[in-house]
C-alpha cells in the first residue's frame, strides 16, 4: 500500500532522454520520472509520486480534496502529541 500526497508540478526537465517532473509540496521539491504515465504532464498539474516515479496525474479538484484530508490528519496528529 502506498500513501502519497499530491505534489504540484513546478518544472519539467529532460535528462539522458528521459522526462522528469520537479514537483513541490509545502516548499519541498522532488524529482519524479514520468515514464509510467500515459498522459502528458504539464506545469501546474498535480501528481502522486512513489519511489521516484510519478504514478498518477490528478485533477485539481481531486488534488485539493486529498490535500485537505492530509491537512486534517496532520492537525489531528499534532493535537494528539500535545
Swiss-Prot record:
Family: Belongs to the HupF/HypC family.
Organism of origin: Methanocaldococcus jannaschii (strain ATCC 43067 / DSM 2661 / JAL-1 / JCM 10045 / NBRC 100440)
Any GO MF annotation of the entry: carbon dioxide binding
Protein's name in the database: Uncharacterized hydrogenase expression/formation protein MJ0200
SUPFAM superfamilies: HupF/HypC-like
UniProt cross-references to PANTHER family, sorted A to Z: HYDROGENASE MATURATION FACTOR HYBG
Top-level lineage group: Archaea
GO BP term, example: protein maturation
InterPro entries per record: Hydgase_assmbl_chp_CS, Hydrogenase_HupF/HypC
A Pfam family of this chain: HupF_HypC
Amino acid at each position: 500500500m502506498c500513501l502519497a500526497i499530491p505534489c504540484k508540478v513546478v518544472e519539467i526537465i529532460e535528462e539522458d532522454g528521459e522526462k522528469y517532473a520537479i514537483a513541490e509540496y509545502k516548499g519541498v521539491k522532488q524529482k519524479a520520472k514520468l515514464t509510467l504515465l500515459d498522459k502528458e504532464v504539464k506545469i501546474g498539474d498535480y501528481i502522486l509520486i512513489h519511489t521516484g516515479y510519478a504514478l498518477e496525474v490528478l485533477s485539481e479538484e481531486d488534488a485539493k480534496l486529498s490535500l485537505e484530508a492530509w491537512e486534517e490528519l496532520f492537525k489531528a496528529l499534532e493535537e494528539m502529541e500535545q
